[in-house]
From Swiss-Prot:
Changing H315A: Decreases the binding affinity for NTPs. Loss of primase activity. The modification N-acetylmethionine is found at M1. It comes from Homo sapiens (Human). Heterodimer of a catalytic subunit PRIM1 and a regulatory subunit PRIM2, also known as the DNA primase complex. Interacts with PRIM2 (via C-terminus). Component of the alpha DNA polymerase complex (also known as the alpha DNA polymerase-primase complex) consisting of four subunits: the catalytic subunit POLA1, the regulatory subunit POLA2, and the primase complex subunits PRIM1 and PRIM2 respectively. Within the complex, POLA1 directly interacts with PRIM2. A ribonucleoside 5'-triphosphate binds at residues 109-111, 160-166, 315-318, 324. GO terms for cellular component: alpha DNA polymerase:primase complex; membrane; nucleoplasm. Changing E44A: Strongly decreases primase activity, which can be partially rescued by increasing primase concentration. The gene is PRIM1. Mg(2+) 1 binds at D109, D111. Residues 363-382 are annotated as: Disordered. This is DNA primase small subunit. It is linked to Primordial dwarfism-immunodeficiency-lipodystrophy syndrome: An autosomal recessive syndrome characterized by growth failure with in utero growth retardation and severe postnatal growth restriction, severe microcephaly, absence of subcutaneous fat, and significant haematological and immune dysfunction. Patients have hypo- or agammaglobulinemia, lymphopenia, anemia, and thrombocytopenia. Most affected individuals die in early childhood from either respiratory or gastrointestinal infections. Residues 363-373 have a biased composition (Acidic residues).
Amino acid sequence: METFDPTELPELLKLYYRRLFPYSQYYRWLNYGGVIKNYFQHREFSFTLKDDIYIRYQSFNNQSDLEKEMQKMNPYKIDIGAVYSHRPNQHNTVKLGAFQAQEKELVFDIDMTDYDDVRRCCSSADICPKCWTLMTMAIRIIDRALKEDFGFKHRLWVYSGRRGVHCWVCDESVRKLSSAVRSGIVEYLSLVKGGQDVKKKVHLSEKIHPFIRKSINIIKKYFEEYALVNQDILENKESWDKILALVPETIHDELQQSFQKSHNSLQRWEHLKKVASRYQNNIKNDKYGPWLEWEIMLQYCFPRLDINVSKGINHLLKSPFSVHPKTGRISVPIDLQKVDQFDPFTVPTISFICRELDAISTNEEEKEENEAESDVKHRTRDYKKTSLAPYVKVFEHFLENLDKSRKGELLKKSDLQKDF
């Protein structure tokens, strides 16, 4: 993938919003079948323009209105907010206190910077294949719980374009949830607690909740290769001292000695498991709980959610198919059938897909000179000729399931009415 030059972004965005952005699918998503009157019209969008100019409370009548505005403004970033009681672009005309956020998808934001205390390869905004496994585990753990523990059907996972992932839960019942219920859900999904000053961030009680057991089973599939080989979390004294801080002091000396005699993280982990197991058998009710090995695995691998993003109904989150202005990468949907294969470094940049389009356009110009073709039809075909196509397909698959589910619900309702 070619390098992205941020100085080219203004020109690239013009082309992207004119010829490549998947407007029809995007509108189809946020309109939700047009079942609820004014649902799309009451949705808040925010645009971040060049030089960090930020405009909130944008709203649009229809797909055409949205397209025109995006092509006029060429936003560097698009965020999606709640569905309000009134049109957001008229919020200043509404009586004080009457303008209220009413519905929104339940959203989750997982950012790699929140793992800086446990990843050794990168820090802050940087990511690499060695630490991306954290995002793979996060998607697997959170998605399994949303699907199986809560019964949520319509979950859209999206790469942020730089260092994290977002999830949009779009079931109709979920969009209506109160802030209190959202807080309860995100609390259920949170285990790693405490700021930078807190060394031990995971505390398990003797009774292990099924959610934790299932999460551990997912982590186990990745732990050896991710934590012991790639992150090498027991490589040297500095790294193993961090782990010793998570276990009772009474076993520190024994572990120090065995760690010094061992040659690598794999061997040291085996020693730790043996010593911890022996300790657990001897002391049933220690304040550290009986699950030392699991607590370490969870602290190093369990998802770290930004709680505030999930609990607030009026919280804005970056839109799918927005462009990251620093990396140039498109914020693309992730195929849940291929989570392990998803590679953020192969996600196309805006410069790459615009070059692809240029190359194709040059070849086709002669052919199309004689053909009258509508701009919409032309654009629908345009993204299909670029590396964006497979990601739009993932999005379309998600939308098809949403449509099927909605039609099923409408049929159920009409059958019930017939019974009366």
